[in-house]
Each structure stands twice: as structure tokens, then as C-alpha cells.
Design a protein with these regions (language model features):
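Bacterial N-terminal signal peptides
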Residues: 8-20
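Compositionally biased alpha-helical segments
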Residues: 20-110, 278-281
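Short carbohydrate-recognition loop motifs
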Residues: 120-139
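Secretory/extracellular carbohydrate-interaction modules
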Residues: 133-195
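Beta-strand-rich interaction surfaces with strong enrichment in secreted/lumenal proteins
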Residues: 140-147, 206-212, 241-242, 252-253
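Carbohydrate-binding surfaces in secreted/extracellular proteins
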Residues: 156, 214-243, 266
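Short, aromatic/His-centered strand-loop micro-motif at the edge of beta-sheets
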Residues: 196-219
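Flexible glycan-contacting loops in extracellular carbohydrate-active proteins
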Residues: 240-267
């Protein structure tokens, strides 16, 4: 719509001036009489909606003056904004990526979703999830969920306790894909052996050999974007790349070798590229002596 037609049309829509607010997407809005303007929705407060015109002016009108379709759009938009505002945020700023929408969240206090809790013994409580390897299984304890992932940020808390190792593992539709492993004295990310019969082999990334307190919770964050993987807990960082990591992830979850380990507050976000990573990532790789 031409700007010189907007003032007249605003009067037809019953618009009044309002203060500046955070803008939504630009789209066409139609009132109950069939008149249309192009504007951004900036707020929905009670029975009023605020719209920002392409000329920069902002106005408020009764929501009921719009078409039923636009009223429903406005309500849904506000619900989405409220969900974004209340969604969990990473505890520290990710390195390689930026978080988009939350696609999974659980405090791990109760069974939620389609977790497979075997082998091993897994229990939920108000303190979170615990897993322990059982000697009779002759295999590490595994609890995984089938849910496709692509480029993501994964964050959770882990309590090592007396366990030998606690891991977060990711599989593709064929086999193991990658994992992050914590022990009482090490932290490492790796690309897994994806075929077990060759030619593919496990590819460990840089190992951080530092003592990790076993009676304290550690926040672990995993970033996966294309062929790259970055894992961090505290100041400890392990990273690397491999073409396998760019594949769609089909299944993911926790692995425990040895005695009881605890987990809580698992959140997964869709990940977007961080424009600064090309520069900051190169510096970090040099610092960690990791090949580009």
C-alpha cells in the first residue's frame, strides 16, 4: 500500500498513536469492513492491538475491529512470544552457535517422552535422574530417546558420584555417532566408530585432563553445527569436526559406566550459526592445539 494512502486508511481503521514497542513480522492486516494495511504487530494488551506502519508510526486499535483470521494470528503471535520469553536459556553463552527455539526440555524428575531405559537401572526423583550399570547386563547403562535432531545446542547437569564415566551419546539411524564423556579426571568429545567393521574409526577430539569434583553438579553444553562439535563444562572445552556429524541425529541420551551418576535439567535448542565463530573458533583451536 502506498504511503500517501495510509493516513486516510488509518482513520478508517480507527487507529490512534501509541509508543514504540518490539516489532513482529510485517504483514497485511484487514479490518471487519475489509480495509487492509501493511504493518508490524508490536503488542497485544487486553482488547487492544498495537501496529507499526511502514512509515515508522505506531498505532493502537481494538483487536475486535480486525478480521477473525487476524485476531487469531495476533493471539497466536503473543502466545509464541510469551513462550520464547519463558523458555530456558543456556546458563552460559554458547561458543559456536546461538540458541533458537527450545525443542526439548525436562528437569528429569519424571519419565517424559519415549525414553528407553535399558540396559542398566534408571530412576527418576525430585533430585533428577540417576543411572547405574548392572553387572548382569555386561554393558554400560543406557537411556536414550528417539527424536530427530540436526543442528542443536544440548545442555544438562551431571553429578559424577562414584561412577567410572558419565556420557551423553548421539546416534544416527545406523549406529553410534558422537558422544561427550566425563570422568573424575577428564573431559572429552569424540566422533564415534559408526560401522564397527571398518573403514570408519572412532575419532577422539582433544582431551581435557583436569580433576572434576565428583560431589558437585557440572553443567555440560554440547553444540553441533554442520560437521563441527564443541563440548564445554566450566572452562574445559573439547572440540573437533567430521563429515559424519552433519548427518541427522536419530537417537540420543545418557550412558553410565560403573556406579551411580546423576543427571538433571536437560534442554535442547535448535542452533543457529554464530557469525563470530570463524574468528573466535580459529583462535580457540590454536589455543587448544586443535587442527583446523
Amino acid at each position: 500500500m502506498k504511503l500517501h494512502h495510509q493516513t486516510h486508511l488509518l482513520l478508517l481503521l480507527g487507529l490512534t498513536f501509541t509508543s514504540g514497542l518490539i516489532a513482529g513480522e510485517t504483514r497485511d492486516w484487514t479490518n471487519s469492513a475489509g480495509k487492509t494495511i501493511t504493518a508490524e504487530m508490536t503488542a497485544l494488551s487486553g482488547d487492544d492491538i498495537s501496529l507499526k506502519m511502514t512509515n515508522g508510526r505506531e498505532y493502537t486499535i481494538p483487536l475486535s475491529s480486525l478480521s477473525e483470521k487476524d485476531q487469531n494470528f495476533a493471539r497466536k503471535w503473543m502466545e509464541e512470544q510469551a513462550a520464547v520469553a519463558s523458555a530456558p536459556k543456556p546458563k552460559t553463552e554458547p561458543l559456536m552457535t546461538t540458541p533458537d527455539k527450545v525443542i526439548y526440555h525436562s528437569e528429569l524428575k519424571a519419565m517424559e517422552g519415549s525414553w528407553r531405559t535399558s540396559p542398566g537401572k534408571w530412576e527418576f526423583s525430585e533430585s533428577g535422574l540417576t543411572g547405574v550399570e548392572l553387572a548382569a547386563d555386561d554393558h554400560a547403562a543406557v537411556m536414550k530417546q528417539a527424536m530427530p535432531l540436526k543442528d542443536v545446542i544440548i545442555e544438562f547437569d551431571v553429578l559424577l558420584g562414584n561412577t567410572t564415566s558419565a556420557m551423553f551419546g548421539i546416534d544416527d539411524d545406523k549406529d553410534h555417532m558422537c558422544r561427550v564423556t566425563l570422568t573424575s579426571n577428564s573431559f572429552q568429545a569424540r566422533k564415534d566408530d559408526n560401522d564397527h567393521e571398518g573403514p570408519d574409526l572412532s575419532k577422539p577430539f582433544n582431551t581435557v585432563s583436569e580433576e572434576l569434583e565428583t560431589d558437585e553438579w557440572h553443567t555440560v553444553r554440547i553444540e553441533l553445527l554442520g560437521e563441527e562439535m564443541v563440548a564445554q563444562t566450566g572452562e574445559h572445552i573439547s572440540l573437533g569436526s567430521d563429515p559424519l556429524l552433519a548427518k541427522e541425529k536419530a537417537k540420543w541420551g545418557f550412558i553410565v559406566s560403573g556406579d551411580t551418576a546423576g543427571f538433571r535439567n536437560l534442554t535442547i535448542w535448535e542452533a543457529l550459526p554464530n557469525e563470530e565463530w570463524e574468528k573466535t573458533g580459529s583462535r580457540l583451536k590454536r589455543k587448544l592445539d586443535v587442527e583446523e
